[in-house]
Amino acid sequence: ACLGQWDSCDPKASKCCPNYACEWKYPWCRYKLF
């Protein structure tokens, strides 16, 4: 399963869902607006 909005993640090994990205500032996945 992939990680969705606000799910905690590791920037070095992001497991976020498609169209989501692991933030560096805060260790969670956020929707990419681009």
UniProtKB/Swiss-Prot annotation:
Sample GO molecular function, one term: ion channel inhibitor activity
Cell compartments where the protein resides: Secreted
Cysteines paired by S-S bonds: 2-17, 9-22, 16-29
Outcome of substituting residue 15 to A: Weak change in ability to inhibit Nav1.7/SCN9A
Chief place where the protein resides: secreted
Keyword Glycosyltransferase: no
Free-text tissue specificity from the UniProt record: Expressed by the venom gland.
Effect seen on changing residue 1 to Q: When modified in pyroglutamic acid; weak change in ability to inhibit Nav1.7/SCN9A
One GO cellular component term: extracellular region
Effect of mutating residue 12 to A: Weak change in ability to inhibit Nav1.7/SCN9A
Record has Nuclease as a keyword: no
Signal peptide: none
Alphabetical keyword list: Amidation, Disulfide bond, Ion channel impairing toxin, Knottin, Neurotoxin, Pharmaceutical, Secreted, Toxin, Voltage-gated sodium channel impairing toxin
Residues carrying Phenylalanine amide: 34
Stated family: Belongs to the neurotoxin 10 (Hwtx-1) family.
Miscellaneous: Synthesis and folding of this linear peptide generates 4 peaks. Only the peak 1 shows a strong activity against Nav1.7/SCN9A. When analyzed in details, this peak shows two forms (P1' and P1''), which may be explained by the involvement of at least one Pro residue in a cis-trans isomerization.
Domain notes: The presence of a 'disulfide through disulfide knot' structurally defines this protein as a knottin.
Known role: Voltage-gated sodium channel inhibitor. It is unclear if it selectively inhibits Nav1.7/SCN9A or shows similar potency on all sodium channels tested. According to Escoubas et al., 2006 and Nicolas et al., 2019, it is selective over Nav1.7/SCN9A (90% inhibition at 1 uM), versus Nav1.4 and Nav1.6 (35% inhibition), and shows a small inhibition on all other sodium channels (except Nav1.8/SCN10A).
Name recorded for this polypeptide: Mu-theraphotoxin-Pspp1
